[in-house]
């Protein structure tokens, strides 16, 4: 086996012109999908996180690269000056920072989950407070402790900590985000005007996803796709019309094949549920990021949902991230200057209130 390697640079999925720092849209540029880690929280849960059963299906090269990424990118998560430098290189004026997905810690016990969520949130808020002109925060909530506990921490995030909302993983153990036990959380999120960003952390059914990093490459957008389906078909979006919901990585696979859910809704009673309108009616309320890597995918996303529902993201600082986010938008030739300004920052500015 050759020496395992991964790169944190311009995507191989498209050609590149001038980088984003040289080609500027009219708006402030906002990266609404970026991460950090809180070391104190990691120390608190050390020894309390169950072994990940998916790892048994991963080849040795994938295991090595996962460990390597954790080591290589740690300072990019935690070093403020380094983050500012990378943002400058990418032409990003502002970041909305959320915890790295593993720091949602849904697999620890409910009691520990409540404690560690608060610690993560305190850490993210303190980090962002050091540069409030360039950073804003999303937190996490202890979903495994139930909807009421999650709603309580959400209120603390939005109030005391001054966050803009929270990040949720795409499922909570064997429960979907649409589980009735979480309804009180969705009620609170809508009432507070909180932004809720759903983010995958690898696909649960890993047996067929082990090789070629497919657990992330295919699994991450697939898990987002499943989460969106449940949130729509179980009526969460119908019951909460003012909910501010983001689906990262361009919303997974659902936007590209959304006609199928409308067809099923019209064709079969078991796909109809209690929805009064076609499923894509609710999908059109969702916001998406630009992490789709190619101009034609971005064009399709904007064509379907409009520049007022698509926002620039990077997934900083991971290897599956977008390291020329402004260039991606500006280089998508079909987009008008007005659309470019909205996607690069205007839509996020309005949604997050920054």
PLM feature spans:
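Mid-to-C-terminal alpha-helical segments outside catalytic/metal-binding sites
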Residues: 1-28, 32, 39-94, 122-130, ...
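Active-site gating loops and adjacent loop-to-helix segments of metal-dependent hydrolytic enzymes
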Residues: 26, 35-77, 204-222, 261-283
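Hydrophobic faces of well-ordered beta-strands that scaffold small-molecule active sites
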Residues: 30-32, 95-97, 136-139, 166-168, ...
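Active-site environment of divalent metal-dependent phosphoester hydrolases
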Residues: 37-39, 103-105, 144-145, 174, ...
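Short, surface-exposed connector motifs at secondary-structure boundaries
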Residues: 66, 132-137, 163-165, 241, ...
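Active-site gating/metal-coordination segments in enzymes
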Residues: 93-234
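A general structural motif
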Residues: 225-228, 267-272, 290-294
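Aromatic-lined glycan-binding groove of carbohydrate-active enzymes
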Residues: 232-281
